[in-house]
């Protein structure tokens, strides 16, 4: 393998889970053996200058599988003398597969995330997914939920070539400090955050996510009157920003729990470990919307929370249950059930010993299965077309 060109619409400095995933994969590849072709975005010049690999920016903020994009991708492949292409998302740029084969690519890999499940549910889009699957060597999937749905629309040959590849977690960045309230060092540490936000001494449930309907922050707020009836001092910390924010604030006021709900707004990625560590329990009761077209891909936040030593409560949407060992690292709940959510939150806040045991189990699981070092081995095997044999932890 001479090198890999990553062709993707999803790449920083644009924010999002897919963007972080694709960037993480790029950083796993050896310098000199990877380049990225991605759309223009505000702040891209400064971001690109800090990367250990070249980033070729498309002049527009969106790339479609049209001839001009195909020509630029082919030119980048030839310029770097690479023979492998990794599509950051199978749909729609995977349709460029035949063009890049003709440009010299001998191996094509297409990642899938969550939106492809929506494509699989639409008659017109199914045919495009099938074409993509037939034109690449490997289609990856996050977990069993998405594998089963994509396999139905791919050809038998393409379905047989599917391989699991999910995001990793920087466990060292999120690992708990020497005491439950210590958190990472520095001004963004848990104790400082609790003090600054008026949470010191209170039981805290934290949710780190964009404020959008699918993530279920509204269900958390609706559960809070019941939670407070069991744990009177319980506080809810909502970390992130998004279009649903004003509605959520009105909901908290209308339910009389605005004094118990703290909205942080957008938080720099480097400070997130401290916000996770400021919580006693992590909860994001995500739910499926739009008849199955809007589902959770994986929910990397559950794994980050586990790496921070927190018990997690997640919704049953899409691949979210793949990021939780139900009953061991936390609980999977019906994403729309206020009652079940309130019961699980209240039970964990009322039993710190159980919560901490689940947090320890989650940290051990993430270290064993989800560390980026594990992802690196899988990625290398997928790009080379070889078998992956994981090294046992500690070996």
Model-derived features: positions:
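A short, well-ordered alpha-helix in the C-terminal region of glycosyltransferases
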Residues: 233, 260, 340, 347, ...
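Conserved acidic donor-binding segment of nucleotide-sugar-dependent glycosyltransferases
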Residues: 325-327, 331-338, 347-353
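Short hydrophobic beta-strand element within catalytic cores of glycosyltransferases
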Residues: 283, 302, 307, 311-314, ...
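Carbohydrate-associated surface elements
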Residues: 145, 168
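Short His-centered aromatic/hydrophobic patch
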Residues: 87-93
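Acidic donor-binding loop of glycosyltransferase active sites
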Residues: 260, 266, 277-295, 310
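Conserved donor-binding/catalytic core segment of Leloir-type glycosyltransferases
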Residues: 188, 194, 199-215, 221-224, ...
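Nucleotide-activated donor-binding/catalytic signature segment of Leloir-type glycosyltransferases, i.e.
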Residues: 249-271, 281
């Amino acid at each position: 393998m001479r090198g890999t060109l990553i062709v993707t619409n999803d790449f920083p400095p644009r924010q999002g889970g897919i963007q972080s995933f694709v960037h993480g994969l790029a950083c796993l590849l050896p310098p000199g053996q990877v380049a990225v072709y991605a759309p223009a975005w505000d702040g891209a010049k400064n971001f690109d200058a800090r990367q250990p690999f070249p980033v070729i920016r498309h002049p527009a903020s969106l790339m479609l599988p049209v001839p001009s994009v195909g020509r630029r991708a082919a030119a980048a492949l030839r310029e770097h003398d690479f023979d492998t292409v990794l599509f950051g998302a199978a749909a729609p740029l995977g349709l460029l597969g035949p063009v890049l084969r003709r440009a010299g690519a001998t191996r094509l890999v297409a990642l899938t995330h969550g939106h492809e499940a929506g494509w699989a549910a639409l008659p017109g889009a199914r045919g495009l997914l099938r074409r993509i699957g037939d034109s690449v060597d490997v289609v990856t999937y996050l977990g069993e939920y998405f594998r089963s749905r994509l396999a139905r629309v791919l050809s038998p040959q393409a379905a047989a070539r599917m391989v699991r590849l999910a995001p990793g977690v920087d466990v060292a960045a999120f690992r708990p400090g020497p005491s439950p309230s210590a958190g990472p060092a520095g001004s963004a540490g848990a104790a400082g955050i609790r003090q600054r936000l008026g949470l010191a001494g209170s039981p805290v449930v934290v949710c780190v996510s964009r404020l959008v309907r699918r993530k279920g922050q509204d269900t958390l707020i609706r559960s809070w009157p019941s939670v407070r009836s069991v744990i009177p001092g319980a506080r809810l910390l909502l970390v992130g920003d998004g279009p649903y924010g004003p509605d959520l604030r009105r909901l908290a006021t209308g339910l009389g729990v605005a004094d118990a709900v703290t909205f942080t707004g957008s938080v720099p990625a480097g400070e997130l470990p401290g916000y996770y560590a400021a919580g006693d329990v992590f909860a994001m009761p995500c739910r499926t919307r739009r008849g199955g077209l809007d589902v959770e891909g994986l929910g990397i936040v559950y794994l980050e929370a586990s790496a921070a030593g927190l018990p997690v409560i997640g919704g049953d949407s899409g691949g979210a249950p793949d990021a939780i060992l139900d009953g061991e690292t936390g609980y999977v709940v019906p994403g729309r059930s206020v009652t079940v959510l309130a019961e699980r939150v209240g039970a964990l806040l009322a039993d710190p010993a159980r919560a901490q045991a689940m947090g320890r189990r989650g940290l051990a699981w993430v270290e064993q299965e989800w560390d980026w070092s594990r992802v690196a081995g899988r990625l290398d095997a997928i790009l080379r077309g070889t078998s992956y044999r994981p090294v046992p932890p500690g070996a």
